Amino acid sequence: QTPSGLTRLADGRFVVADFGAKQLRIFDAGGRALRSIGRRGRGPGEFVAPSALDVLGAEEIVVLDVGTQRVSVVDVQGG
């Protein structure tokens, strides 16, 4: 695991960009892992080098993937 970005949702959950696993990882406010989103690749829902994160809405975040030079909007409930 290689964390490269972090943001906190309004309900206290954390979203971590994992550069090494090419995923986003969701944690509860206490640090317990809840789920992972994404996989290695260049298609929808896939990442090459996820890095910066920011909250867009209650369940949405913006992800900068420096490997694809792409910005994606991700729903943390549905991926």
Identify the residue ranges that each predicted region occupies.
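Eukaryotic scaffold repeat domains enriched in small/polar residues
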Residues: 1-79
